[in-house]
Amino acid sequence: MYDKKLAAYAEKHCACVRQLDLCARYFCAGRINAEVNARLHKSILDGMSRAWKNAQAYARRHGISAEEMRSYQWH
């Protein structure tokens, strides 16, 4: 089953995961300080949470099962 809107939410979630990884790498490399890193992490985590909640709500409204949701590649 393929659903463009759900796929878009999944892509947003995955983009947030990639951004979070990039932030962690830059922080570990000493390129951004702890305060900036914390703000970026919070912003990205908020984005991930919104994308996931939107995807769940969309799936419920359109009768997409939990099994079908799990079949999407979220990470």
Regions found by a protein language model. Name each.
Residues 26, 33-72:
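Short, charge-rich amphipathic interface segments used for partner binding and complex assembly
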Residues 1-17:
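Short, charge/polar-rich alpha-helical segments
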